């Protein structure tokens, strides 16, 4: 079969026009094209057909040094990446090339990054709770196996640290594989995460096949084409793990889904599409839907997805985070106000929610305790204006008691993380669900009204709080 060869006619930023004149056959939309820039392979993806013989493409790599007239070959298929157990313990880029300096990924399975979502008949509707060991999440916004979870927060409130703790707690306790897609985030964080995984044994350098995680990175310095597609590359690997050996449970982490939207917006502008609200691409909902609908559980295996979602200027009504809301089963909202109090994880207990916080699923006791905790915190929030203006002395005895309990609950929602041990010096805690429910039940019932507030700060179980109270006396 003769190769379909074209030539570059125009380069504007990350957009490249390629003219095919030899046999009049244009590459299909989304096909991958290859060219070489000083022996370096560059992949282009067909985005538009303009005229009879020219295609407009988005580059997946840096364009530095590329010139007009360079030959381009149509590969005849979309971007294809290696999948399967050979990817474990390795870092690859959007087009499946290893970037960890450890040689080629020798996989016999190569898969396109574009696939249809599983049929309705193949999807699973079972509902099982995924225990994370993080009190505030397990009690107030529990995660489901095979669910989609969003971590919402502005800059610097702890999204990446929370994701790293979830990888530490869930991936270690969980039998299946994990895929981490780094979408447009800091290269330093990607490097830190990789070395942390090596130190904790999640990645085994001596025997990579014993590793539990595959990493796909398209960091901040990459062109928008790579950042817009790297989540799909990560998802393709996650799907291959889910469907292998008659089904596996897979964890799929994306940090950060906002950068996926942001890159799509850049690509859209470069292609000359008219922007919609706040300058986002007109296809925002479609792009998000195509990614999210593939993250699902089948009758054989599940993909549980945790997605960090940056909130521009802390505005949850911005179209990018707002479009994500519709697809999620649980939302964990990180609050700057709570972080300023020094309470970590800075999860907002009133804004965060989960579809599975239902007595039919979590049980009557769990549901009742969670709602009582939220009620106490909501009452405290509504009393805050009175406290600010008139002071605590003007409150009724009942309200004073509610405020005291709420402040203890707030502090008890904090917890030392394993991955933050190097910063805090405090040993990380994994708290079982039964201990979490028992602790908060005692707090709302007033069993610990005599203990000082400070005893509840940065501890695991209620027994640790009681021990800490003894040392504070």
UniProtKB/Swiss-Prot annotation:
How does it sit in the bilayer?
Peripheral membrane protein
* InterPro entries with a match to the protein in the record: AAA+_ATPase (IPR003593), ATP-synt_VA_C (IPR055190), ATP_synth_F1_bsu (IPR005722), ATPase_a/bsu_AS (IPR020003), ATPase_alpha/beta_chains (IPR050053), ATPase_F1/V1/A1_a/bsu_N (IPR004100), ATPase_F1/V1/A1_a/bsu_N_sf (IPR036121), ATPase_F1/V1/A1_a/bsu_nucl-bd (IPR000194)
Extract the CDD domains matched here: ATP-synt_F1_beta_C, ATP-synt_F1_beta_N, F1-ATPase_beta_CD
Name the enzyme's class: translocase
EC code:
7.1.2.2
GO CC term, one of those recorded:
plasma membrane
User: Any idea which UniProt keywords this protein has?
Assistant: ATP synthesis, ATP-binding, Cell inner membrane, Cell membrane, CF(1), Hydrogen ion transport, Ion transport, Membrane, Nucleotide-binding, Translocase, Transport
Q: Which GO terms describe its molecular function?
A: ATP binding; ATP hydrolysis activity; proton-transporting ATP synthase activity, rotational mechanism
- Residues binding ATP, per UniProt: 153-160
Which reaction(s) does its UniProt entry say it catalyses?
Answer: ATP + H2O + 4 H(+)(in) = ADP + phosphate + 5 H(+)(out)
Physiological role: Produces ATP from ADP in the presence of a proton gradient across the membrane. The catalytic sites are hosted primarily by the beta subunits.
Q: What is this protein called?
A: ATP synthase subunit beta
């Amino acid at each position: 079969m003769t190769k379909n060869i074209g030539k570059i006619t125009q380069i504007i930023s990350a957009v490249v026009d390629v003219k095919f004149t030899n046999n009049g056959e244009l590459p299909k939309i989304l096909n991958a094209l290859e060219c070489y820039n000083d022996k370096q392979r560059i992949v282009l993806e067909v985005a538009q057909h303009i005229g009879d013989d020219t295609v407009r493409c988005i580059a997946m790599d840096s364009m530095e040094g590329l010139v007009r007239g360079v030959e381009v070959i149509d590969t005849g298929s979309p971007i294809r990446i290696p999948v399967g157990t050979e990817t474990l313990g390795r870092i690859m880029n959007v087009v499946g090339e290893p970037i960890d300096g450890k040689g080629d990924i020798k996989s016999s399975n190569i898969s396109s990054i574009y696939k249809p979502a599983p049929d309705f008949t193949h999807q699973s509707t079972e509902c099982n709770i995924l225990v994370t060991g993080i009190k505030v999440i397990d009690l107030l916004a529990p995660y489901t196996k095979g669910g989609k979870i969003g971590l919402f927060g502005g800059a610097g409130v702890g999204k990446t640290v929370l994701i790293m703790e979830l990888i530490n707690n869930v991936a270690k306790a969980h039998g299946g594989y994990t895929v981490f897609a780094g979408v447009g985030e800091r290269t330093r964080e990607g490097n830190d995460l990789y070395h942390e995984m090596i130190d904790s044994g999640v990645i085994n350098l001596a025997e990579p096949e014993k590793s539990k995680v595959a990493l796909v990175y398209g960091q901040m310095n990459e062109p928008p084409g790579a950042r817009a597609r790297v989540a799909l590359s990560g998802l393709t690997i996650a799907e291959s793990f889910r469907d292998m050996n008659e089904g596996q449970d897979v964890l799929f982490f994306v940090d950060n889904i906002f950068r996926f939207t942001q890159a799509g917006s850049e690509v859209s502008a470069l292609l000359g599409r008219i922007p919609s609200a706040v300058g986002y691409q007109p296809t925002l909902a479609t792009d998000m839907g195509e990614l999210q609908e593939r993250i699902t559980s089948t009758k054989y295996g599940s993909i549980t997805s945790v997605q960090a979602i940056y909130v521009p200027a802390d505005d949850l009504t911005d179209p990018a985070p707002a479009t994500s809301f519709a697809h999620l089963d649980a939302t964990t909202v990180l609050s700057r106000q709570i972080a300023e109090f020094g309470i970590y994880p800075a999860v907002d207990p009133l804004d965060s929610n989960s579809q599975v916080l239902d007595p039919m699923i979590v049980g009557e006791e769990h549901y009742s305790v969670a709602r009582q905790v939220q009620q106490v915190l909501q009452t405290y929030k509504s009393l805050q204006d009175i406290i600010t203006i008139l002071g605590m002395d003007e409150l009724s005895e009942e309200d004073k008691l509610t405020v005291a309990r709420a402040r203890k609950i707030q502090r008890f929602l904090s917890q030392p993380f394993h991955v933050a041990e190097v910063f805090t010096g405090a040993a990380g805690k994994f708290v079982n669900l039964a201990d979490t429910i028992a602790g908060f039940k005692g707090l709302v019932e007033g069993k610990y009204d005599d203990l000082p507030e400070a005893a509840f700060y940065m501890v695991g179980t209620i027994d640790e709080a009681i021990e800490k109270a003894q040392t504070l006396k």
